Structure formats: structure tokens, C-alpha cells
Amino acid sequence: MGAKREEVLTEKEKTRTAYHEAGHTLAAWNLEGANPVHKVTIIPRGRALGVTQMVPDEDRMNMSEQEIIDHLVVLLSGRAAETLIYDELTVGAENDLERATSMARRMVTHWGMSKELGPVSYKMSDEDPFLGGQIHKLSLIHI
């Protein structure tokens, strides 16, 4: 969870963080492919204002596409909860967005889980660090 930070959150920040973490928690409780919730806190730790810790029931070496999608939903549910309650976005979901983007990108570029592009692995090179550039080049070849 990271080291506890000493700064004190305002009541407004605590409430917003609680809604954010509740979003993660509710999604994890309701999605079959999500890992079970182990611990939830709104005590700031590391870079996070709050943490919802999920721990798998067993060690696993493989995940189904639906389990990955459920994991993506859980990652994005904190931001969704904030948006539903406050009708505005904050920077608090930065790590969630980074992790969701990385996982979604791997679904397409490494695991062939794109219905549109098909079962192909697109290895990213240093010359084309952005997914769109690499796939755009491949699309032009097919045209």
C-alpha cells in the first residue's frame, strides 16, 4: 500500500477519495472476474490519496479476456464514481488511468484481443512508441 504520508486531507478531499475508493470497491464486489477486495483506506499512502487493495484467491499465471475487462472496469470505476457524484474530473485517478491504458494496450498489442485488428501481436519499437503510429502503418499496408 505504500508508506503512510503525514499530510492531512481536508474533509472535502477525504469525501471525494472515499467516493473514488467506493467506486473501485463496488465494481470489484459485483464483477465475477475481479479480484476480491482485501482492504480499503482513505489514509494517503505513497502517491495515492486512498487505496483499494484487491488480492486474488489463488496464484494465477493466466487471465481470460473477460477477467481483464473486469479488471479494467474496476480500475476506471473510481473515476466514474467521482464523475457521478461531482460531475467533474480530478487528477486523482492518474495511476488508475496509467494502469488501465497499459493493460488495454497489452490486450491489443501483445495478446491479440482486438476484434477489429484480429489475433495479431504488434510488437512496439522504440521508433514508434505510440500505439496509433504502429497500427496506422500496418493499416496503410492493407489499403
Which positions does each model-derived feature cover?
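Hydrophobic alpha-helical transmembrane segments of multi-pass inner membrane proteins, especially
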Residues: 1-3
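Hydrophobic alpha-helical segments, principally membrane-spanning helices and signal/leader peptides
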Residues: 5-6, 29
